[in-house]
């Protein structure tokens, strides 16, 4: 074993070990998150969160005011207000650092496996030279032998090999990668465990799957999504409005012959602006991306995840998504005048050279239920399946055995469909109507009978589609099956619509039709022919084991190559949007409640008429403002777990979700400040801090 092979194996081992040991529990991340909370006090970092930048500026101002004598505000009270303003900023920074910490633990383990990799790059003269993997550019060709690591994302242009993708997918079983077809794409930092591959690099440094995955989980470097930018604008607008409100209070107080200390006005501003959502907004987005990474899905941008939350239509391939995809032989039906033994012998011979899962299932079925003497494989002349003939079988001892699609088999023996025996025709129709696939068996110009291949619908898929329907999402099954078979499986699975005998052009046309009617569309695919539809869809998820063209066209890549993951991505997207909306509602409701709770307590001495609004009966203006500041800081801490976990989206339509969230987070946001501020006021008064 050469040095490069040994180094590659060591790198893979260390990567897996670190990935396994990387602790992402909250308890293990608290200390580094606390340290990062102080680092993030740098105003340059807070520029991404305008609301919290305002809070930090008020904390600085209040701290300075502590050194300015003011008979209206005891120094001890001013100092407490300053401390709690700093705590407010630190708590918000802590929430963001905690969300980032979970992603960074994963990023560190991913980075560890990619360090120190080398590659055998092909020169112009056809020879190979050893270079550092990070120097490779798009279009370079490298040779990867058994035991070596694939240095970057690319396309197999020559060779067939087993590849261990555990460093990326976590799945230890090797997968086959070969040139041509839909299994030609390879991912950097995976290991060839047998044979060799010639790979054309498809991504420049910093653009590979691994690089995108690391960038995704390192939340601090991510770009804000359009929804986050829009929400930032709203929060800035509310901050300016409340700033104007607070500024006008000073003249009102002076006009009435009273006075409001500057410390109180600064603190009042912080209690009124939307600090709750302002402090948690970044953590919500980072935690949402982290949930996506835990699903082993990487996104090229946050836009795709947000779009997934707003999707109206899901286009899902039948095979592998709705059904298991491994059709199995479940029954044989003999034509009139043909014995069961003759049909079994013909079906077995027509399937002996068929290495597809369907062909193997027919052989297994017949060996168990209809055992017959089999000829040796070398005596057979195999006839492979082709898209033109849609038949496969063997020639043996001058005899011809074929099996295939109904129309293809009938055409092979020159038998019109209307002359097909009625009893067998009825059985074929029953198979198709039940969702199965009928194959006809013919031998030497005779029709022997039919084979029933059954495709099993995945358990629980009907219930998942029902949940999506209650969320207002329509599901469309895409299949190459005939309309009868497609309709039967669609009815069993519970999808809303079906595209039978689908082609890439049909998929693309359906996506454009839905988008033309104002709906967002999501789909998944893996082949080069899926690339146009993946690029057109609002959310396109490519399989990691698919072609490079599909992965480049999509805005999401599933490293596990599981098409059903699209349903989970939609769930994550909805949770992200609902969490952001719920906490925004809670924060704004908080501000409204605090406005009516605190202002009467501050002004009752200046305007006695406001006593009727002073429902909380706070002990004094000092205790009122201090209680509000303490509540304002502590509510951020209380909501950190919800921001990181996300609001669970239950199966309900949009109006029900809105009513539920308005009740919980809207009404809750109005009530919580009254209860919380009153409780803190009593506590501060009892211990003599106000």
Curated annotation (Swiss-Prot):
Any one of the GO CC terms: potassium:proton antiporter complex
Catalytic activity: K(+)(out) + ATP + H2O = K(+)(in) + ADP + phosphate + H(+)
Residue positions binding ATP: 354, 358, 385-392, 403
Active site positions, chain numbering: 317 (4-aspartylphosphate intermediate)
Entry function: Part of the high-affinity ATP-driven potassium transport (or Kdp) system, which catalyzes the hydrolysis of ATP coupled with the electrogenic transport of potassium into the cytoplasm. This subunit is responsible for energy coupling to the transport system and for the release of the potassium ions to the cytoplasm.
Stated family: Belongs to the cation transport ATPase (P-type) (TC 3.A.3) family. Type IA subfamily.
Oligomeric and partner information: The system is composed of three essential subunits: KdpA, KdpB and KdpC.
Protein name from the UniProt record: Potassium-transporting ATPase ATP-binding subunit
The organism of origin for this protein: Pseudomonas aeruginosa (strain ATCC 15692 / DSM 22644 / CIP 104116 / JCM 14847 / LMG 12228 / 1C / PRS 101 / PAO1)
Gene it is expressed from: kdpB
């Amino acid at each position: 074993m050469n040095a490069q092979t040994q180094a590659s194996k060591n790198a893979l081992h260390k990567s897996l070990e670190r990935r396994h040991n990387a602790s992402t529990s909250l308890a293990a991340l608290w200390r580094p998150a606390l340290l990062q909370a102080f680092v993030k006090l740098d105003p340059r970092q807070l520029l991404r969160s305008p609301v919290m930048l305002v809070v930090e500026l008020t904390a600085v101002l209040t701290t300075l005011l502590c050194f300015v004598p003011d008979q209206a505000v005891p120094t001890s009270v001013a100092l407490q207000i300053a401390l709690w303003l700093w705590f407010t900023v630190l708590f918000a920074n802590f929430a963001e650092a905690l969300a980032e910490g979970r992603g960074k633990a994963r990023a560190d383990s991913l980075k560890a496996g990619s360090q120190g990799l080398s590659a055998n790059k092909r020169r112009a003269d056809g020879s190979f030279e050893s270079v550092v993997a990070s120097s490779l550019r798009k279009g370079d060709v490298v040779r990867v032998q058994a035991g070596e690591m694939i240095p970057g994302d690319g396309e197999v242009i020559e060779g067939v090999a087993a590849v261990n993708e555990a460093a990326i997918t976590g799945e230890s079983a090797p997968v086959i990668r070969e040139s041509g077809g839909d299994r030609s794409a390879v991912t950097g930092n995976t290991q060839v465990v047998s044979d060799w591959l010639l790979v054309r690099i498809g991504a420049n440094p910093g653009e590979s799957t691994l690089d995108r995955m690391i960038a995704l989980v390192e939340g601090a470097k991510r770009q804000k999504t359009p929804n986050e930018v829009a929400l930032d604008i709203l929060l800035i607008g509310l901050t300016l409005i409340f700033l104007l409100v607070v500024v006008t209070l000073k003249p009102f107080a002076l006009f009435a012959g009273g006075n409001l200390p500057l410390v109180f006005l600064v603190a009042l501003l912080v209690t009124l602006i939307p600090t709750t959502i302002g402090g948690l907004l970044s953590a919500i987005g980072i935690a949402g991306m982290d949930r996506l990474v835990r699903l082993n899905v990487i996104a090229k941008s946050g836009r795709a995840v947000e779009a997934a939350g707003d999707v109206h239509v899901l286009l899902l391939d039948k095979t592998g998504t709705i059904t298991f995809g491994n059709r199995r032989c479940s029954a044989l039906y003999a034509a009139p005048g043909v014995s069961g033994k003759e049909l079994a012998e013909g079906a077995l011979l027509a399937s002996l050279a068929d290495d597809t899962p369907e062909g193997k299932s027919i052989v297994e079925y017949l060996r168990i239920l209809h055992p017959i003497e089999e000829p040796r494989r070398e005596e057979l002349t195999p006839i492979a399946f082709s898209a033109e003939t849609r038949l496969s079988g063997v020639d043996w001892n001058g005899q011809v055995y074929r099996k295939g699609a109904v129309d293809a088999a009938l055409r092979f023996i020159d038998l019109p469909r209307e002359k097909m025996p009625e009893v067998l025709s009825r059985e074929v129709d029953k198979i198709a109507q039940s969702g199965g696939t009928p194959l006809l068996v013919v031998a030497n110009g005779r029709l022997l009978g039919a084979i029933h291949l059954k495709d099993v619908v995945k358990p629980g898929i009907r219930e998942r589609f029902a949940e999506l329907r209650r969320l207002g999402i329509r599901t469309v099954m895409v299949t190459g099956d005939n309309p009868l078979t497609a309709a039967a499986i669609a009815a069993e699975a519970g999808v809303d619509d079906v595209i039978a005998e689908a082609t890439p052009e049909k998929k693309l046309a359906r996506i454009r039709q839905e988008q033309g009617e104002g709906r967002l569309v999501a789909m998944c695919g893996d082949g080069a022919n899926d690339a146009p539809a993946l690029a057109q869809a609002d959310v396109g998820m490519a399989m990691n084991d698919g072609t490079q063209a599909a992965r480049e066209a999509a805005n999401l890549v599933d490293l596990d190559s599981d098409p059903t993951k699209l349903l989970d991505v939609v769930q994550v997207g909805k949770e992200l949007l609902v969490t952001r909306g719920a906490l925004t509602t809670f924060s704004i409701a908080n501000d409204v409640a605090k406005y009516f709770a605190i202002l009467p307590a501050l002004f009752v001495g200046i305007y006695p008429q406001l006593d009727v609004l002073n429902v909380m009966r706070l002990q004094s203006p000092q205790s009122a403002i201090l209680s509000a500041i303490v509540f304002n800081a502590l509510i951020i801490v209380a909501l950190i777990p919800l921001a990181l976990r996300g609001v669970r989206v239950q199966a309900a339509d949009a109006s029900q979700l809105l009513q539920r969230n308005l009740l919980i987070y809207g009404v809750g946001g109005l009530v919580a400040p009254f209860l919380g501020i009153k409780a803190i006021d009593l506590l501060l008064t009892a211990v003599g801090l106000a």
